[in-house]
């Protein structure tokens, strides 16, 4: 590689992107510096702005520039349904189907004991409190008094996603919540953001 600490630093930074190895990162770095310096500066400014301005929605945990995201703030959404997904990308995939008009809760991950990711790391207690709020005495509200009437589990059909869905389902069912899971039309081992929209729409419609 060229003798440049700055170039090495850029290459190492690009390697932090998912699926980008050393060779791909080097190609990107050389391309930007050789052929598109204005584009490189645009990327740098956009990235800095996004990091500084984007936060987690106070209600659903997705990424937003506001305290409450556009979806949660929309009075036209069906507030009786809460769809649980792993990532904002999964949420976006479901939105593109136009088959779901409820609200979301974004875990920002999945349970993975081998990687040290437990319930607290993906905000399960926040999810439980959102789905089944407590009264002034600390007791769960009766089902008829809750805003959320159904929790739809749309975690990915991977081993970790299935385990996460199982833990959530057990906890919420014990609190008297109706819990459904996307139908098995979504291939085992797949991630929602890579599944075609028709398949996702059918999985939503046929959930059980």
Swiss-Prot record:
Q: Which Gene3D superfamilies match?
A: 3.40.1360.10, 6.10.250.240, RecR Domain 1 (1.10.8.420)
Q: Does the keyword Acyltransferase apply?
A: no
Q: Which Pfam families match?
A: RecR_C, RecR_HhH, RecR_ZnF, Toprim_4
Instruction: Give the record's keywords alphabetically.
Output: DNA damage, DNA recombination, DNA repair, Metal-binding, Zinc, Zinc-finger
Keyword Zinc-finger present in the record's keywords: the answer is yes
Fetch the CDD domains from UniProt. Answer: TOPRIM_recR
Give any single GO term for biological process: DNA recombination
Q: Which family does it belong to?
A: Belongs to the RecR family.
Protein name stated in the entry? Recombination protein RecR
Q: Which gene encodes it?
A: recR
């Amino acid at each position: 590689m060229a003798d440049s600490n700055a170039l090495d630093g850029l290459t190492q930074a690009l390697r932090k992107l998912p699926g980008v190895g050393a060779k791909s990162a080097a190609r990107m770095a050389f391309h930007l510096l050789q052929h598109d310096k204005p584009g490189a500066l645009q990327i740098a400014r956009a990235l800095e702005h996004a990091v500084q301005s984007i936060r987690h929605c106070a209600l659903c945990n997705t990424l937003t520039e506001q305290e409450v995201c556009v979806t949660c703030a929309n009075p036209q959404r069906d507030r009786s349904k809460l769809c649980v997904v792993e990532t904002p990308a999964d949420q976006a995939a479901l939105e593109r189907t136009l088959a779901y008009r409820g609200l979301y809760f974004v875990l920002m991950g999945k349970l993975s004991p081998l990687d040290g990711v437990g319930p607290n790391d993906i905000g399960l207690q926040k999810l439980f409190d959102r789905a089944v709020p407590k009264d002034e005495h600390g007791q769960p509200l009766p089902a008829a008094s809750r805003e959320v009437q159904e929790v739809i589990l749309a975690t990915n059909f991977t081993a970790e996603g299935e385990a996460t869905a199982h833990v959530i389902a057990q906890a919420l069912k014990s609190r008297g919540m109706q819990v459904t899971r996307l139908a098995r039309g979504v291939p085992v081992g797949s991630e929602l953001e890579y599944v075609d929209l028709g398949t996702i729409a059918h999985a939503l419609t046929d959930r059980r």
